[in-house]
Amino acid sequence: MKKIFIKIARLFGYEIIDQNNFVSPSLNKELNDDLSIINERSIVLPLGNVDITKKVRSLLIILRMNTEVEIWDQKKKRLFEQPKIEYSIRSINSLIKSIKLCKNKYSHLSINTVVIDDNSKKENLDKIKDLIQNENFEIISLDHEKYKSIIKKQKSAETFSNLASLLQSFEIGKNQGDDLIFFIEDDYIHYETMLEEMISSYERIASQLKKDLIMCPSDYPYLYMNNEKTNILIGSKRHWRTINKTLCTFMLSKDLLNKYWENLYKTCIDRHDPFEKYINEIYLSEVCISPLKSLSLHLTNINSSYGLSPFIDYKKIWETNK
């Protein structure tokens, strides 16, 4: 009789909760397990389930890498004060771990990664190639010449290269992206669960809102320096908050990239104040969210308002991604 009742309940879209034994008989799981059904339902206790209508099919990751410049446009040193190549290695290593964990859960999901390299010396580039040799990564060189007639003359070669690599990453997203596109910089170290949580939370929240959204993986300190109102949303495993500013690490859909191509393009034609001026304009019309707490750590100077997320064990995440 119990089995028949469970089948009938599931037929009508319900799951059974046995709070006495702390299990779900219909899902055959304990209640502190992941109760969600991939691409079908996102289940968070005690809020029930969300039917997934925004299903993620593929993810294109585009990582901008510069293993030589310590901190662009600054003379300050990063946390731990190591050569820049050490940050690039740890960033990519953490990304590889996150991709593998995500693929274990979302085996149907196509994940491809393109690395845009900006003039790394051979010694550094060889280290990166060794790191990714068995992964679905492609390294391409930044085409400086292509953008000399497009980007306005800048005060420094570093600024020009930064704008050029950003424009090349946006163009690759436009030409090669199919579903979700994730723009990443090589001074972020990611938690292993980062991608899996971003995908599952994207599906849940976008399905609830019935629209595409933009996600930033980092909980920046500057988000707490102004008395700005925000909305708190429930993701798959943590809270997310609405934000109206990001840096250049964010994930969005191909449809949103096409819709706001002019904003992305104008960001790269000249240096603006703030740098992300035209990107931030997008968030006046679209929902952008970041996690509470952070899924990725921006390793800048310890005093930077654009860097270290609060309540993170910085040394642990650094040491575990050598």
Which residues fall in each region the model found?
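Hydrophobic targeting segments
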Residues: 59-63, 95, 111-115
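A solvent-exposed, charged loop/short amphipathic helix patch at secondary-structure junctions
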Residues: 62-90
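Short beta-strand/loop segment that forms part of the nucleotide-sugar
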Residues: 107-120, 141-144
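Active-site-proximal specificity loops/subdomain of glycosyltransferases
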Residues: 121-178
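Conserved catalytic core of nucleotide-sugar-dependent glycosyltransferases
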Residues: 173, 180-182, 189-264
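Short, acidic, metal-binding catalytic loop of nucleotide-sugar glycosyltransferases
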Residues: 79-87, 91-109
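Membrane-proximal basic amphipathic "stem/tether" segments
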Residues: 1-42, 322
